[in-house]
Design a protein with these regions (language model features):
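ATP-dependent helicase/translocase motor core
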Residues: 2-293
Length: 293
């Protein structure tokens, strides 16, 4: 019981941070639709609140089957183009054209764009039962407007398990053929996390899954320094995954390198921590001091 409590405490700490100052709301695992791998309640809430005119067109087209009709169209587009494309370009279900995400305008002067940006709904859902075949659950799934963007498997060294166990769990116990875990069409990144280190992958591939460190580095070495948060890895949820940051990553930093001849060789590139940090510091410096210095 003590071990279980320590694991749950770690999970709750992440949830609390994202809910309290990360710009998220709490998702309900019962709203997760295993057939389509989306949070249908938040998906339709986002569409209706942010684009009522386009939603009305969908209702006129599909009638009483509007939700099912749109889910089928969404499924096809995600299968064909992928999650990153859908976030950036939206869904056309003629005559309706729906944005699935609104990115932050370059200037706060555009009040309409800013208002739409604020309509985004980021949510954190714990213990998501994702499979139609079994009752396996993932510790944490993050959603943007009901669409899954990231998973987290958490371990606490205080229980005798580390980030290596989280990686092993992804490789051995998480079937990449499951829709939520499928490359390109659903989650964009998967994090293996403990209280000391973070590792990531954009493509689950069984025992061949390749993880990259997502650590800050510690005095020129590997790992993470002691920070201001509760854990050495608190920067992940206190900084990287907070609302503005995650939406910015989806908009500007993730890159899908497709191999049309051999799709299995396609690669999703998610920035390492230091890459993200350097680019953002450079951009902030330009905004503050201008170019040409």
């Amino acid at each position: 019981m003590a071990i279980e409590t320590k694991e749950i405490t770690f999970e709750r700490e992440i949830e609390y941070s994202l809910l309290d100052h990360g710009g998220y709301i709490k998702g309900n695992p019962r709203d997760y639709n295993r057939e389509f791998a989306v949070d249908t309640k938040l998906l339709f809430r986002f569409l209706q609140e942010s684009q009522p005119a386009e939603w009305a067109k969908l209702c006129k087209k599909h009638g009483d089957d509007v939700e099912t009709g749109f889910l089928k169209k969404l499924y096809r587009d995600l299968d064909t183009h992928g999650m990153l494309y859908v976030f950036r370009h939206g869904i056309v279900d003629a005559p309706a054209k729906l944005s699935m995400c609104f990115f932050k305008p370059a200037s706060g002067m555009n009040q309409t764009s800013q208002a739409l940006y604020e309509k985004n709904i980021l949510s954190i859902t714990r213990q998501v039962h994702y499979s139609l075949k079994n009752e396996n659950s993932i510790d944490v799934v993050l959603f943007i407007n009901g669409l899954p963007v990231a998973t987290l498997e958490l371990k606490n060294p205080a229980t005798g398990q580390t980030v290596e166990n989280a990686k092993h769990q992804y490789m051995k116990d998480r079937d990449p053929r499951e829709l939520l875990l499928s490359f390109k069409s659903r989650c964009l990144v998967h994090f293996a996390v403990d209280t000391d280190e973070v590792w990531m992958t954009t493509k689950l591939d069984g025992i061949n899954t390749y993880f990259l460190p997502f650590n800050k580095g510690n005095n020129g070495g590997k790992g993470n320094p002691v920070g201001s948060g509760t854990y050495r890895t608190s920067y992940l949820w206190d900084e990287v995954l907070q609302k503005d940051s995650l939406l910015d990553i989806v908009q500007r930093f993730i890159h899908l390198q497709e191999d049309k001849k051999n799709p299995k060789k396609s690669v999703m590139i998610f920035p390492r921590y230091h890459q993200l940090d350097v680019v953002r510091k450079l951009v902030a410096d330009v905004y503050e001091h201008g170019t040409g210095r």
